[in-house]
């Protein structure tokens, strides 16, 4: 009988049953492709993450992460599952993390190898940090009314003083709503939205507002993902760089800030938040700082 340690982690939160959930599977190198897919289907979460040795030499990587959806399909990268995996590894004292301190790892994914940092000064509540990919915001090729029609919403849900924009690195679309009230009332027609998503290869529709439930935060957002079969994601780490870039580009926050708080998930009953560190330079860049909480650990047994 083969056994695999598994850990259920809620990422982008420090409270159980909030943020975005993932299951982390350790020692996955002896699992077949079919077994990984079946495990992900059984866990029935948006993504399950598998920890393996790096698949190649020549480029330095400490370990590899693979991400499979509830349908058993593999995706190149998943932010909340990455946070969950690093949190679980820190809690289990893997890869030399046996003492309080600072640790950095080169993490191989199908989207590339990334430097990820774990602040384990307090091992009970490690802080996970990593640089977000290059951000390339451009004005979208349609106006507010066209977007509203394509999403099946009233145009008044959009702040028409702010442009609709697309972040080309990840193919995420961003638009602004006037207030938290309008953001909370937003109901996207998933069928219509999927048609636009397929046509323009848009992975995420991000609705944001420069208002927040927590006074320490500067922005609240919602994430609609019909292209990948997710009506709404509780918390989407990959779109946070675009959120920060949009806010700074249009001076919707104090542009002297070195860190902004971003929240998501409250309208789904799974509130979460991250800190986005703004890295000063000729090109906008930022770094994500996230917490997580582990719900349980178990052993998965397979013949």
How would you label these PLM feature ranges?
Residues 1-77, 83-303:
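Active-site proximal loop and beta-alpha junction motif in alpha/beta enzyme cores
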